[in-house]
Design a protein with these regions (language model features):
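N-terminal Rossmann-like NAD(P) cofactor-binding subdomain of oxidoreductases
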Residues: 1-145
Length: 145
């Protein structure tokens, strides 16, 4: 599954650390308005989780983690992101800015197949808590929180 992360703050970086090592998941791209060098620094050194065990560097305007190149963008408008060209299956929306059904739509318009909103969202977006209400999950859903 090809994943893009929109918003590389506390939640985006925490998700990255878990997903990067998970079989079947590939972090393809990150979109964040911060400077690339700063994003790399914050991934390397976390005040809660400590030093990241994988090597992290910046090369050719990409984040390189354990020899894996990750595209990095600094785009305010998600509709302008190249999710279609990158064949993104899921965007993890962790910016905190796109917390409604309608606000997540630009990611889908840009070519992502699904959006997972990490913040509380409006009532149109199904709220799923793993281990509690997994029965709400369906392949037909394009957005969940």
């Amino acid at each position: 599954m090809r994943i893009a992360i929109n918003g590389f703050g506390r939640i985006g970086r925490s998700f990255f650390r878990l997903a990067f090592q998970a079989p079947g998941l590939e972090i393809v791209a990150i979109n964040d308005l911060g400077e690339l060098e700063n994003l790399a620094y914050l991934l390397r050194r976390d005040t809660v989780y400590g030093l990241y065990e994988k090597p992290v560097e910046v090369r050719n305007n990409q984040l390189v983690v354990d020899s894996h190149n990750i595209f990095v963008y600094a785009e305010k408008d998600p509709a302008k992101l190249p999710w279609r060209d990158l064949n993104i299956d899921v965007v993890v929306e962790s910016s905190g800015a796109f917390t409604s059904y309608a606000k997540a739509q630009p990611h889908l318009d840009a070519g992502a197949k699904r959006v997972v909103i990490t913040a509380p969202a409006d009532s149109q977006v199904p709220h799923v808590l793993p281990g509690s209400n997994n029965d709400k999950l369906s392949r037909d859903l394009s957005r969940i929180t």
